[in-house]
């Protein structure tokens, strides 16, 4: 497909962080000043994940009140509408926005108001994934997830675990996600983004419906088989992973390997603004770099419809679009 055809293609995105995907327009309006390119996005010269994460300081400041959260929800759907995204799951960590005057419930409700406004204006279906953070205590994370559970089916669709994977392995969170499962809340887990493939196995064993990144399965056919047989979706984010040096170079990135292994692979942006990317750019990149053909691009979209944390009627509509 040409770039224009890719842009017009109805697209599904399942792994998109709110704070890493806010537009320059939104950030400048909130901050009341011009924002420089180097404050917004990394370049190809990005040396590490630590350097990549520095870009999140600015958007974090803008998500500390209800007006900011509501505006952010609207803003991210506006951005997505410009490239024909028809369904998106937006993830964020509510506890990073909690203040003395704004509790978790108000944080989530504010974001949902903005997303609902965006849905009506731009005709994009959405859901929210609430992220537990690895550096927060088990009690903090569980209380947040209990609050998020109140919104399940009315804007929130699932939970996630994000943060420093190497420092806080999945084994430390098995009890938390067993409790999450007991709450009746589906979840995805950032696992195998860097380092230990054991985190992927633990995520699957505790009941994750999807895993974020999963690149530590590279060259691990037994783990790939485990993921495939458990029908666990794999949320891949090629451009972001190359920028953070999660792999040493594009030839080491296992997208083709995972597709050929029969995994339910999806392609996503991760952080639209920080990575200076879009779904169109991601698809164009994998076409050129990995020889992904048109039928495989449609397969990636059908996979996304299949493993979305959406209601069945929404999933069925998405599948019809991706035929």
Residue ranges and their predicted role:
Residues 1-185, 194-199, 205, 209-210, ...:
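Metal-cofactor-binding active-site regions of metalloenzymes
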